[in-house]
Amino acid sequence: MATLKDQLIHNLLKEEHVPHNKITVVGVGAVGMACAISILMKELADEIALVDVMEDKLKGEMMDLQHGSLFLRTPKIVSGKDYNVTANSRLVVITAGARQQEGESRLNLVQRNVNIFKFIIPNIVKYSPNCKLLVVSNPVDILTYVAWKISGFPKNRVIGSGCNLDSARFRYLMGERLGVHPLSCHGWILGEHGDSSVPVWSGVNVAGVSLKNLHPELGTDADKEHWKAVHKQVVDSAYEVIKLKGYTSWAIGLSVADLAESIMKNLRRVHPISTMIKGLYGIKEDVFLSVPCILGQNGISDVVKVTLTPEEEAHLKKSADTLWGIQKELQF
């Protein structure tokens, strides 16, 4: 007896489903799901896989997204506790880990999250040996180093979301002051994602007009307009949002989808993201910090050599020393 489906549809070939643009998100907390929905809305994947240890929450989030399939263009949304659901991913976004508590520094989280990564990373490598790893969990620079060490991947394929969001916050706040859309406000925050990030005031511009040339005190203590406060707001913003709503999610989700787009579409856009910077700016250790990187289908293919003031370079070196001080104590 022919089924309804048989009566309706005449099959022409037996297809093997192998995804070509699969993205996995590890961790279905607020950040993971914000990344997932942002990636879905940008139509970057032909399959999205979600992984977590909390099975009920995981299944619920998957179903909730599947029920929106009519409004999306990603034909397959899957999930599982077992990493076999992640097989053949081109990009794996890692958001899993202990969440930063109110008032807790990102660095304080570190050993808790290293232990989680010791389980996650080998499983990802097993099922998607050719993927790019995009680390979002905090402290992101150290955990990107941890992911690189555990995975054995070449450094171009291990990327930290880094200062992509810090720079976006900076450009938003700058735009608010000037009455200009953030896309037209150019400025870079480099170094550590977090408390010791470095604003590159010399490069801040609108339409190629250097703000530092117009206003030489820009970013200094002598500045009567207190532009330095903009960077302080960037540093404080995550803490403020956590204090108000308990966590951050939307902006980091959008930031991650922005990076995913550059990778999946091989855009070769320049982003301030965390990469291994040994050999740059006099840094001699295996540390990951944000510098402007060209991002495409192979991950980070090139780094843009930014001219920093001696003060900015010293700041970056200090960040590197702080991170290395923590990294060398880590138990793998």
UniProtKB/Swiss-Prot annotation:
Residues binding substrate, per UniProt: R106, N138, R169, T248
Modified residue annotations for Phosphothreonine: T309, T322
Residue positions where N6-acetyllysine is found in the record: K5, K14, K57, K81, K118, K126, K224, K232, K243, K318
Its EC number(s): 1.1.1.27
Catalytic residues in the record: H193 (proton acceptor)
Modified residues (N6-succinyllysine): K5, K118, K318
Keyword Kinase: no
GO molecular function: identical protein binding; L-lactate dehydrogenase activity
Chain residues that bind NAD(+): 29-57, 99, 138
Subunit structure: Homotetramer. Interacts with PTEN upstream reading frame protein MP31.
Protein name: L-lactate dehydrogenase A chain
Designated gene of the protein: LDHA
